[in-house]
């Protein structure tokens, strides 16, 4: 029987645009000298940093008067969307909360907006860190102080600038559908996003960010944070890597239960479920013990929430982002099925025709597919791992050329795939690779739109277009073999190599060449006067001066024009087409339909 549940430490991810201060903020939280005392010391976990509640209350002070049952905050060390979307837990995001870092002087940038969209998709609470407040001209630094204390020390001009910049963020958030306010003015945390002006460089405002996160967890998340302390461990694999003397290891965020040395564990591999036993659990040594040769300290067990390194046999092929479960009291089959189902539950809606997507982790694959779905881009196949030769060949067989593409998120392209791409038979296939989802999608959309225009242009070029011409008086340069006459183009677009017909439908010959100002041209627009050579007729017999002639468009071309390109035709082309089809449909009402 499991003992009574306890409240675990909430897991926090830091997100935001490149260079807005995500890493600096994490570094400041990790290395804050204010809390580096023995009691309530900030401890370094594998892939995460634990800030205990004692440290938070000492930094801010305000929570000391409130009863707090959240043990602290566990920050995932890898900042950015990728960490957030990669780390899943039971179908949702592993992170319980997020900090979105925004440069208060630059405002929202594309990655900021993408972060907010991802958080909205996952229904994850977050706080805005309006960073680099110390860069505002005239700002007086008050190292590590809460925002309101440091704000009170600024002159009126600086205070006014801070207020203006905060309200610019409020306005932008409102445009994106979020209600927000400066954190000290928020009364309903469920309906308003808190904006905390801060400086990762000086530590100003940092206590407030931690306090707001604790407050959010305390008020709205105590139920979802309840775990069974002695229950079987459940976690998410951050990274799979080889360590000297240990072999293959897993960096794991444990979010439920307890994991012990000797526990049987189940984890997802590339194409199979892997069962193995925990050989050792390792924590990084504190900085004070850095001179000790061993980098890791061995522990017998670990309880959620924590970052831990797991050494075990048979870990080759484990997927980053995979769920990991401990087996207890004979529920092995149930756990295997649970892991299999969780991997299969990745929400990727596949279509018969679509792009091929690759990513380095399960969660990243799901995040990419969700964003593609939001842009109405269909996905035919979604797989974890690098881009292979098989992917390129498969993309080359996709019927719709606008989907002959592979999108690779945070994962490499193998050399055999590069070789396959160099084959002339695969020249129509493109690979888009990178570590930022919105950039990948922008690049693909730009390529697709260009390709669409090119295909339409090619289709247009192959079609015989409508034209109506009149033979001009005093412009018969040769009567036959071929007849050479001057004509005015009354409507449409005249092309070389097309057949001509009289208004009664009688075919009279084919245009061999068009000349304008003594130069051969392939086509000429309405209103122009040109000389044409016509194979077939004799002037004075089949054709005469002042005769009107139409380009005799094949029926199949008329069908394509009317169904697919009519909207792209100029008024002159449309009018001439209508005249020509009206003449044809006098005899056969269904001609060209």
Swiss-Prot record:
Chain residue ranges for the region called G3: 77-80
Gene Ontology CC, one term: cytoplasm
Domain annotation tr-type G: ranges: 7-221
Binding sites annotated in the UniProt record for GTP: 16-23, 77-81, 131-134
InterPro entries: EFTU-type, P-loop_NTPase, Small_GTP-bd, T_Tr_GTP-bd_dom, TF_aIF-2_arc, TIF_IF2, TIF_IF2_dom3, TIF_IF2_dom3_sf
Gene3D superfamilies in the cross-refs: P-loop containing nucleotide triphosphate hydrolases, Translation factors, Translation initiation factor IF- 2, domain 3
Region (G5) residue spans: 199-201
SUPFAM superfamilies reported for this sequence: Initiation factor IF2/eIF5b, domain 3, P-loop containing nucleoside triphosphate hydrolases, Translation proteins
HAMAP family: IF_2_A
Official protein name in the record: Probable translation initiation factor IF-2
Organism in which the protein naturally occurs: Methanoculleus marisnigri (strain ATCC 35101 / DSM 1498 / JR1)
């Amino acid at each position: 029987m499991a003992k009574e549940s306890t409240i675990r430490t909430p897991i926090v991810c830091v997100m935001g645009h490149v260079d807005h201060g995500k890493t600096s903020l994490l570094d400041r939280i990790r290395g804050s000298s204010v809390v580096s005392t023995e009691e309530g010391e900030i401890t370094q976990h594998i892939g995460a940093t634990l800030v205990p509640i004692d440290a938070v209350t000492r930094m801010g002070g305000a929570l000391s008067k409130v009863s707090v049952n959240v043990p602290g905050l566990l920050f995932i060390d890898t900042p950015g969307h990728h960490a957030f979307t990669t780390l899943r837990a039971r179908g949702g995001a592993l992170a319980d909360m997020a900090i979105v870092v925004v440069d208060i002087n630059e405002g929202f940038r594309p990655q900021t907006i993408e972060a907010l969209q991802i958080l909205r998709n996952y229904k994850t609470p977050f706080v805005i860190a309006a960073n680099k407040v110390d860069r505002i001209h005239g700002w007086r630094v008050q190292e590590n102080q809460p925002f309101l204390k440091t704000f009170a020390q600024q002159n009126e001009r600086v205070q006014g600038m801070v207020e203006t910049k905060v309200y610019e963020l409020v306005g932008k958030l409102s445009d994106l559908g979020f209600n927000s306010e400066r954190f000290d003015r928020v009364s309903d945390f469920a309906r308003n996003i808190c904006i905390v002006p801060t400086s990762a460089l000086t530590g100003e405002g940092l206590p407030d960010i931690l306090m707001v996160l604790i407050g959010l967890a305390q008020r709205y998340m105590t139920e979802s944070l309840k775990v069974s302390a002695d229950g079987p461990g459940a976690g998410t694999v951050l990274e799979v890597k080889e360590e000297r003397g240990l072999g293959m290891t897993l960096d794991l965020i444990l979010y439920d239960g307890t994991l012990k040395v000797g526990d049987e564990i189940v984890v997802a591999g590339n194409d199979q479920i892997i069962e193995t036993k925990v050989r050792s659990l390792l924590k990084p040594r504190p900085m004070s013990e850095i001179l000790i040769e061993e980098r890791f300290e061995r522990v017998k067990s670990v309880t959620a929430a924590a970052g831990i390194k797991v050494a075990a046999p048979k870990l080759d092929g484990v997927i980053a982002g995979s769920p990991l479960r401990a087996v207890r009291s004979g529920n092995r089959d149930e756990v295997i099925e649970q892991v299999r189902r969780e991997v299969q539950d990745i929400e990727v809606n596949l279509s018969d025709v679509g792009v091929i997507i690759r990513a380095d982790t399960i969660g990243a694959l799901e995040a990419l597919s969700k964003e593609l779905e939001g842009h109405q881009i269909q996905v035919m196949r979604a797989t974890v791992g690098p881009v292979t030769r098989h992917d390129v060949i498969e993309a080359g067989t996709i019927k719709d050329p606008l989907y002959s593409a592979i999108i690779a998120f945070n994962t490499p392209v193998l050399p055999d795939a590069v070789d396959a791409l160099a084959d002339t038979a695969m020249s129509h296939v493109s690979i888009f690779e990178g570590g930022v989802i919105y950039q990948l999608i922008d690049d693909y959309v730009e390529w697709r739109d260009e390709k669409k225009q090119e295909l339409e242009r090619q289709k247009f070029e192959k079609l015989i277009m409508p034209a109506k011409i009149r033979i001009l008086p005093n412009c018969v340069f040769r009567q036959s073999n071929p007849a050479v006459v001057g004509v005015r183009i009354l409507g449409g677009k005249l092309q070389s190599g097309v057949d001509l017909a009289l208004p009664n439908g009688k075919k009279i010959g084919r245009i061999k060449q068009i000349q304008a100002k003594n130069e051969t041209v392939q086509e000429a627009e309405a209103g122009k006067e040109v000389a044409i050579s016509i194979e077939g007729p004799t002037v004075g017999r089949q054709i005469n001066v002042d005769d009107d002639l139409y380009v005799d468009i094949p029926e199949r071309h008329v069908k394509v024009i009317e169904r697919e390109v009519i909207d792209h035709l100029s008024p002159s082309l449309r009018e001439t087409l209508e005249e020509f089809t009206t003449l044809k449909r006098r005899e056969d009402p269904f001609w060209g339909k």
